[in-house]
Amino acid sequence: MSKTFARSSLCALSMTIMTAHAAEPPTNLDKPEGRLDIIAWPGYIERGQTDKQYDWVTQFEKETGCAVNVKTAATSDEMVSLMTKGGYDLVTASGDASLRLIMGKRVQPINTALIPNWKTLDPRVVKGDWFNVGGKVYGTPYQWGPNLLMYNTKTFPTPPDSWQVVFVEQNLPDGKSNKGRVQAYDGPIYIADAALFVKATQPQLGISDPYQLTEEQYQAVLKVLRAQHSLIHRYWHDTTVQMSDFKNEGVVASSAWPYQANALKAEGQPVATVFPKEGVTGWADTTMLHSEAKHPVCAYKWMNWSLTPKVQGDVAAWFGSLPVVPEGCKASPLLGEKGCETNGFNYFDKIAFWKTPIAEGGKFVPYSRWTQDYIAIMGGR
C-alpha cells in the first residue's frame, strides 16, 4: 500500500462520524450520457476479455448506449484515494471504505425508486449499516463473500481448521516450517482477521467486535501480527501476484478471496479453501455514486442492471462471491444449481463483515491508528 492511500485514509477519517450532508437525489432520469466510469475490484466487471462466457457489460452498453470504462483497484484505501481525486461515477466499495466515502462526502445518496430491481434484494443486506446512514441510502448492494483460508492440498492432505497456520510459527504436515510459505493481506483491515484469531485464542481479553478494539485488545492483536511478520512470504493485494505465488513461489497458505481459489482450481492447481474454526471476516460491497458524477443517468442504469438475476449469478460464478439478489442463485448456468451453497450463501450470519473502525469518543482504536500501525508492521517495525 502506498503512503498516498494511507494519507487519504487518515484524512477521510479525521472527521467526526456525523450524518453526512449531500445533494438530494434525482426524482427522474434524463437521457443517458453515453459513458460510465467505474472503480471496481479485479474480476468484478467483466466484458468477456478474460473468458468470453463472462460478460455482463456488452449487453448493457448495447441497451443503454453507455460505454463502460473500468479502473481496477486492489485495496479499499486505493478506492478511497481514487474517489478523492475524482473523475469517476461509481465505485464498488467494501464496508471498510463506504463509511469513509460517505463521511468524506465523496458519494451521494441515491433514490431507490429509480432502481426497479431494488425490490428483489436479499433482506439480509438491504439495511446494512455500511451504506445506510442518517436515514439515507448511499448506493446499491452488489455482492458479498468471505475471506477464506486458501491452502495447498499437497501440503495439507487434511484441511487445516485454524488460522494458526498463518499466525503461529510451526512445522506444517509436510514436515517443513511455515516460515516464508504463508501470506497476509496488504491492508490495515487485516488487523480484524488477527483480532478474530485473538478473540478465539485469548478469550480473557473479551473481544466482541473485531473492528472495535480497546487499547489493550488492540495491543494484543498487534503482538500477533508482529510475530507473524517473520513468517510472511509477501503481503498480498494483487490477486494475480498471489495466484502466481501459490503456483511458483512455494506459498501454501493465506487468507484469500474465493476468486483466486476458483481461478487456480480452474487451472488444475492443488488448492482448496476452508472456513476456519475462529471464523472469518468478509465483505459486503456496495455500488456507490460519486458526489460529482458526470454521468449519473448511466450510473443509475448500471445500478439497476447490476441487480438483474443473471448478472448477479454470473458475477458470483466468476468471483466466487454471493449474489445480493437471491434469484441470482438460480439464474446463471455458469454458477450452477449448487453455486451459492458452495460459495457460502448460508454463512452470512457467521461472517464479520468489513467496516470502518470508529473511536466512539476514545473508547476504541480508530482506523487512522490501524493504518499507521499496519504500515509499520509490514515494514518490520
From Swiss-Prot:
Residues 1-22 form the signal peptide. The keyword Signal applies. Disruption phenotype: The deletion mutant contains 30% less cPHB in the outer membrane than the wild-type strain. Natural transformation rate of the mutant is reduced by 2.7-6.7 folds. Mutant is also defective in chemical transformation. CDD domains: PBP2_polyamine_1. It catalyses: (3R)-3-hydroxybutanoyl-CoA + [(3R)-hydroxybutanoate](n) = [(3R)-hydroxybutanoate](n+1) + CoA. Optimum temperature is 37 degrees Celsius. Disulfide bonds: none annotated. GO terms for cellular component: ATP-binding cassette (ABC) transporter complex, substrate-binding subunit-containing; membrane; outer membrane-bounded periplasmic space. It is found in: Periplasm. InterPro entries: SBP, Sperm_putr-bd. Optimum pH is 6.8-7.8. One of its GO terms (molecular function) is polyamine binding. Its main location: periplasm. Induction: Induced under nitrogen-limited growth. It comes from the Bacteria. One of its GO terms (biological process) is poly-hydroxybutyrate biosynthetic process. It is an enzyme of class 2 (transferase). Its EC number is 2.3.1.-. Keywords: Acyltransferase, Periplasm, PHB biosynthesis, Signal, Transferase, Transport. PANTHER family: BIFUNCTIONAL POLYHYDROXYBUTYRATE SYNTHASE _ ABC TRANSPORTER PERIPLASMIC BINDING PROTEIN-RELATED, SPERMIDINE/PUTRESCINE-BINDING PERIPLASMIC PROTEIN. Catalyzes the formation of short polymers of R-3-hydroxybutyrate (cPHB). Involved in natural transformation. Probably part of the ABC transporter complex YdcSTUV. During natural transformation, may bind dsDNA and convey it to the inner membrane channel formed by YdcV. Belongs to the bacterial solute-binding protein PotD/PotF family. This is Bifunctional polyhydroxybutyrate synthase / ABC transporter periplasmic binding protein. The lineage of its organism: Bacteria, Pseudomonadati, Pseudomonadota, Gammaproteobacteria, Enterobacterales.
